[in-house]
């Protein structure tokens, strides 16, 4: 065994261990739960199977998938050439029924709930990655500018959990097509702000997905969702009553085995009938034919019978994912292809998810001024590139941005400005709860100076600000593997240099 192989193996093991120890623990309390969880033990007689494992090991482009409102089918892309499930999975029998509710006090809390339950990083809980899922369960009201609130009644019968062994994920042969397509990517991106520069990367994501299913939880589950615009000002109790009545109907709501529904009064039922909310019933797991029969208002006996199917006929009710670039970075650390895995990660997180597309405006005299661009960080290393999202400098860009105003001062832009290239910055709060710095042409009065200088009774852009500001940085995505990679590449260069003498 070569010294290089021993060193690289030791460093990779150390890096993976350090990442596991140092990764931030994300808050898994994704919604406000006022009701205690009710649990019940069940005996699981089912054995692990292809049906119970579902899409385990398959790749999906998550931003196109509905992770909430329907059964998630095992139709993903092949990522591994050979992945023997009996050898490569750890299956744990669960055997519990849980009944609880989740209150979503904002759109942000709904995004956080989806991100936590699927093991998708909190930094990716926004509209690009999870917007399809949130829109599906709220009938698109959460995709508008409106804030939403809501609640779900959660009835979950857990049969078993099947998770891929890390050793198999890191060592089993990848699909030959994936290897071929990945290694054919460009290592160096010459103009990273242009989407066309990333064409091959985008095609790879569309074909193989941004994530693989790392864990499959099987059983049977029923979720009754209700949502409304926050401006309608419904309280928690109103959502609870609406969900209970929607699930079982007004005459059988008290028969539900659910503490939150047992005390619903006739007055509350009548009041709820006049309250307009979005309702969505989601049935997952169990038998296909049983799922198909559970529509509309459900009889409590139907519900209990379906939940018990987790004992004998479980199918997936929840998936947890792992980024495909994490797998690729581990496989290709210390090689010339590692930069491609880093590129893939930062292109997805910064360009696509954060929304750092190239933005510019043109002045009345056809002069172009850039407002936003995805570019290399000043400290970027070709072996492990780092990118940033930059917003254009505040203030004037051209002389046409500056306008003389009485009392001897200069205004930059303004309501009557035709140049459209005097920039200002603002912080926009996203539905995910994060904030994003944006650059826009100033159309408001009173934006004084900002690079404009008075020359007699004329104003010129004599002192423009040339400093771009960062709104997103890929340095946050750097991890121990990047450091290991740089050590290995430096050792390779030294060894090659010595061999030439």
UniProtKB/Swiss-Prot annotation:
Major subcellular site: secreted
Keywords tagged on the record: Coiled coil, Cytolysis, Disulfide bond, EGF-like domain, Hemolysis, Nematocyst, Secreted, Signal, Toxin
Record's signal peptide: 1-22
Subcellular location per the Swiss-Prot or TrEMBL entry: Secreted; Nematocyst
Cellular component, GO annotation: extracellular region; nematocyst
Cystine connections: 389-402, 396-410, 412-422
GO BP terms in the entry: killing of cells of another organism
Propeptide residues per the UniProt entry: 23-35
Domain MACPF: 23-359
A GO term, aspect molecular function: toxin activity
Purpose of the protein: Causes lethal toxicity to the shrimp Palaemon paucidence, and hemolytic activity toward sheep red blood cells.
Name of the protein: DELTA-alicitoxin-Pse2a
Record organism: Phyllodiscus semoni
